[in-house]
Regions:
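A general structural motif
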Residues: 5, 57, 117-119, 188-202, ...
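Short beta-strand segments
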Residues: 167, 384-386, 552
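Short glycine/proline- and acidic residue-enriched helix-loop micro-motifs
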Residues: 133-135, 184, 348-362, 497-501
Length: 577
């Protein structure tokens, strides 16, 4: 850093360069014009700057930053203007908060002297984002800009990761500053490791008859997947990976039970049902996994970096607040080992139903789509999804091989997440094939980001599982309301009856023609497949085609996601067919 007078905008990019920021996903606007002017100036001079990726809506930019962070483990950054730019970022911020994604969201703000005057495009960004962010800052004085930016990135990526919001007044971007205030990073004491508590957990795991490890997204965030696999072998204990933990252990590992919970695998849910000890590592006990009666008849142990998660929803018998690195290092250094031959024999029997078999049909089975893509990519592609039935099928039937290849909105369940997140994931690793699995409902919520795909020549392979329904809600309507469908049919128009009960395959003609998108977005190749007989060849052709490809896959409208633990029920009431 130099002490030459410069503007806040210049300082902004000096700090981002120093922090190693590669990409800014965003959209421009009046309150961030000084930043874009400085960016353009540096680009003309061929100076080092983060590459700016112009997304077509700020929400898309926010999800792209999430996708980048989830795929790389580095902090993702989004930039937007004040007012509607900031409010459009609210959903990605909340999404990143729910799933503990290391992100920094930078917004412009009206000049400091105009705050509180109801100025044009003024919103209280700090107040709005306080409950949905890890921390937030309002920069009114350029002298605070550097330390705030450095603190924001440190907070986003440390401890339990999460989104940090930095709201920068326009006059702070324009103001000149000579010697900047010295960076002020808050003193952070390392978490003291309680060896006695760790030993108690290891002893319980070694002496349990039917132990199960529940590995969460914290394993991915900590880069502890390899350590987890060694730990699983050391204690010969089956492991279930939560939705956000998928990829932490390879599918082929004999201890792997798959995903637990409402739409979890049969072996995962059976094992959790019958376990006498559940050890949660880096994951919370959310309502989709810790269903009714979850803790009955078993001991619960919990290791997490966030003390607020201990005893939050499930009573724990043994708890340890620690980094996973410290816990695994302690475990590997210990002399403890365990064998559970009878329990593992039962696990092996249950694993024959993972993933769950499904019957053939005259219509394309979505499960088959995922299995074929898994085979075509050797289970190594970065797999991104939207939210809905397609998301669950992808989680169930793709054979994950590594961490950070599964990118999906878990805690918030944000429809429209998939396409922009896939963009960010590709920028995180352009050499890695990125496959997007989406539904026709979720895909249309951020369809404008196809313009970002073609403008940047991003070779995404996009597969829309098209059932012309908001399928997950339709499934609940069929199971819980006698098949009465209320505004879940995407083919619905003003000629339809108020209560649509019949599922008519011919209604698809009233839907948008996804094949026509190749006429709207140059460089985009579109394909369609309706017949199971042509499915494998179409998917193979799509994966082999250069550039971005969109495949419209017509699936059975009535297909449900199974297994399913109905709301308010326990694992013993899991519906399998």
């Amino acid at each position: 850093m130099t002490n030459t007078p410069r503007t806040g905008a210049a300082l902004f990019f000096d700090v981002l360069n120093d922090l190693g920021v590669e990409y800014l996903f965003g959209h421009t606007g009046g309150a961030v014009i000084p930043l874009h002017v400085e960016l353009n100036k540096r680009m003309r001079r061929k100076q080092k700057v983060p590459r700016f990726i112009l997304c077509r809506q700020e929400g898309g930019a926010g999800h792209a930053a999430e996708g980048y962070a989830r795929a790389s483990g580095r902090v993702g950054v989004a930039l937007a203007t004040s007012g509607p730019g900031a409010t459009n970022l609210a959903t990605p911020i909340a999404d990143a908060h729910k799933d503990s994604v290391p992100t920094v969201f930078i917004t412009g703000q009206v000049p400091s002297f105009a705050i509180g005057s109801d100025a044009f495009q003024e919103v209280d960004t700090v107040g709005m984002t306080r409950p949905i962010s890890k921390h937030n800052f309002l920069v009114k004085d350029v002298a605070d800009l550097e330390w705030v930016l450095r603190e924001a990135f440190a907070l986003a990526g440390s401890g339990r990761p999460g989104p940090v919001v930095v709201d920068i007044c326009k006059d702070a971007q324009l103001a000149s500053v000579g010697r900047q205030n010295p960076p002020r990073q808050r003193h952070r004491e390392p978490i003291p490791f309680d060896a006695a508590r760790a030993d108690a957990i290891l002893a319980a795991l070694a002496t349990a008859e039917r132990p199960v490890i529940k590995a969460g997204g914290g394993i991915i965030h900590a880069g502890a997947a390899a350590a987890l696999c060694r730990f699983v072998e050391q204690f010969d204990t089956p492991v279930t990976t939560t939705f956000n933990g998928l990829g932490a252990v390879p599918f082929a590992l004999r201890h792997n039970l798959g995903m637990p919970g409402m739409h979890g695998s049969i072996p995962a849910n059976y094992a959790l049902r019958d376990a006498d000890l559940v050890l949660s590592l880096g994951g919370r006990f959310d309502d989709r996994v810790a269903v009714k009666g979850f803790a009955t008849g078993k001991r619960i142990a919990h290791v997490d970096i966030d003390p607020s998660e201990i005893d939050k929803t499930v009573r724990t018998d043994l708890a340890l607040v620690a980094t996973l690195d410290a816990f695994f290092e302690h475990a590997h250094a210990s002399a403890r080992r365990a064998q559970h031959p009878d329990w593992m024999a039962q696990i092996a029997e249950w694993r024959t139903q993972m993933p769950m078999p499904y019957p053939s049909s005259d219509y394309i089975k979505p499960q088959a789509v995922i299995e074929i893509l898994s085979e075509l990519t050797d289970g190594t592609a970065t797999l991104v999804t939207g939210v809905g039935q397609h998301q669950m099928w992808a989680a169930q039937y793709y054979r994950f091989a590594r961490p950070r290849q599964w990118i999906s909105s878990g805690g918030l369940g944000t429809m429209g997440f998939g396409l922009p997140a896939a963009i960010g994931a590709w920028f995180a690793n352009p050499e890695q094939p990125v496959v997007l699995i989406d539904g026709d409902g979720s895909f249309q919520m951020n369809i404008q980001e196809l313009a970002t795909v073609v403008a940047n020549r991003i070779p995404l392979k996009m597969f829309v599982l098209n059932n012309s329904f908001l399928g997950m809600v339709r499934q609940w309507e069929d199971m819980m309301d006698g098949g009465h469908h209320y505004e879940t049919c995407l083919a619905r128009n003003d000629e339809c009856e108020p209560d649509c009960i019949d599922i008519d395959q011919t209604c698809r003609r009233q839907l948008p023609n996804l094949m026509g998108l190749s006429q709207v977005y140059p460089r985009l190749t579109t394909m369609r497949v309706k017949d199971p007989a042509g499915l494998a060849d179409t998917l193979r052709q799509a994966m082999a085609t250069a550039g971005p490809v969109l495949v419209d896959v017509w699936i059975d409208k009535a297909e449900n996601v199974l297994p399913m633990v109905p709301p308010g029920h326990g694992l013993a009431q899991m519906i399998e067919s």
